């Protein structure tokens, strides 16, 4: 089955079984805005709890925070978001659709990688255990041709994104013959920048002084509160501050279900350390965070690092942990060495010292920072994509089994009375009442056959089911 068809089935399954609904659906919905249903919210909460326990509860030098969504507007001036939080956009004149120019080019580069992967897969199937991939890559003409095209395009793209050079981005799109996915034409406008922040007015006045922003990231709340947390918690470097919360970006090209939305949730940690030690901690958290993902048992081969070619204005190192979705490897978590940029900017714009006093060195300085940031919705999608499985039954029918990691399953256990007789429902309810204080437990009404009840629990990823019969 084509991966595109698999993804459509996953989206349909999410709606049918109460994981994700289109928001405001009775009013025909709102583009790229979704609600999490009764099973989706449990899965999402379990993801957040799994992360919080591993990051906050298991580390003595990491604490939590819940900062406000609205912040003083100067915060976003200091952070660079007002002036630099932009995407390069391009329109197709025929379809009237708008795209991110960088994404169009990256998707085009991925096609060269896909061609190489197909050649390797065919050769591996043909030669079996004797296949030497390194030699094949170095000698096969088709692989070499596509690798050269990829390398040449990658070099031009990297150069264009420094700045970025908008004219060069359009030139690449034209030179590569990239077409609009809707119209199939190459009738493109010029590339221009678009700021991604949502703004609104606070209070009764509606002038420039009342302008505030919906936060585009959760990190800045940690930065402006870092000194308060450090002093009240008597924290010593290195230490981390974690936060889970909503962020908002006016994505022009929101797509791929909950992967890219305008309202989304982040799980972030800012880890503060001595200047000069940030790269050591960057490498440390890269390994720790990948191990956390792999511990879920979704296949180590489905994860990879992707180092950033173009660094954000605040970073001196950055990498993504990518997961293999049905539409390719995509970022689920970012690890960034943000230097002391953010804290220094807030010190500059606020006019207040937020330096850390190091008692061992007997000096004050602005700490450096290493960030780990997960998109909760992307994590949710990666779990659903990996867990979705169709099984062929002996009678030719197909059933869906959601093989969720047990720690994340919305319902941990379902209890089924075999039928309505001999006090079996009452006994089943007693078992549910005892278990529900420990984990989410579901009672399966005996009006349906036992087979249907089991199949429904398979479809929502329940790892354990108990049948109460006359021998119980």
Regions found by a protein language model. Give the residues of each.
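NTP/phosphate- and nucleic-acid-binding module
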Residues: 1-472
